[in-house]
Amino acid sequence: MRLLTCLINVLAGLTLFSQFQRAFGLTITRRGFKVQESDEEPFCALHHPNTGEYFDLSGLIRDNTSEKGDYSVNGYDFGTNFSINLCHPVVSNLTNYTVEGDVSSEDSIGGFFTVEDDDLYSIGQAAYKPYFRGKKLIMQLDNGSLCPKSNHIRMSTLISFTCNRDPYTAPSVITYVGNLNDCAFFFEWKTIHACPTVKKDSTLNPVSVFLLFCAIAFLAYFVGGFVYQRVVLNARGLRQIPNYEMWRSLFGFISDIVIILYSSILSILPSSITRMRGNRRNIDYVEDALIDDIDT
């Protein structure tokens, strides 16, 4: 019987472990368990195709909850400033503007400039995947407003990212470099987020591994014991629980301890209250005596 119970528990444990491994994508390494990673690059981040270095630009995103709003870029001799966001549509309120140039979707504009206060031109739809061209980390925004004097060519933007670790400069500096025929715009973005970093390791720490094994062992014990009690011993109800008598005795023991502690606390509280009242009476008596001495 004991051998049969052990075999059932082992089979249940192996089955549960394989289910955990498939569900969470766990792989066994020398350092422990590691979560299997997808082949796709993370959002707004990438690895260098040659060096394998990891670059994460997600820290530059300005979403609807950001108090800073879109990035404002000085246009210098272009005559107007630009508003740009990264890996997210612009968060500026565009309802007061007239979007020119037959833009397909105003909700996905990634950058724009305005003319005469109310005419808005999109310089590209929001892009979400940076990429490398040689050693240059860039992001390209396409499908903006129609270019001047064109019925099919649309405005686009090219952003070149440069690593900037200088602690004495602004954490993010965007510079307008120039444009081609008021149709293609070029910006340089200096930021520490463009520097290679280390991707967060997805290896489970020893505590997580220990807790995972404990959970699998407990489930294997419970499932295997339940099957054994029901199939072999024909148990029903609560007696299907493995080692039901042991758990019942343990629960009764814990209940007795709780009742004893509760009764002990209740027996201590009245004496403490009585002592506090006695101390208060003594204080009142001393105060009355001092007042009488002062009056005499």
UniProtKB/Swiss-Prot annotation:
Pfam families: Man-6-P_recep. It comes from the Eukaryota. It is a multi-pass membrane protein. InterPro entries: Man-6-P_rcpt, Man6P_isomerase_rcpt-bd_dom_sf, MRH_dom. Keywords: Disulfide bond, Endosome, Glycoprotein, Golgi apparatus, Membrane, Protein transport, Signal, Transmembrane, Transmembrane helix, Transport. Residues 26-206, 271-296 are lumenal. It is found in: Golgi apparatus, trans-Golgi network membrane; Endosome membrane. Glycans are attached at residues 64, 81, 93, 96, 143. This is Putative mannose 6-phosphate receptor-like protein C530.09c. The lineage of its organism: Eukaryota, Fungi, Dikarya, Ascomycota, Taphrinomycotina.
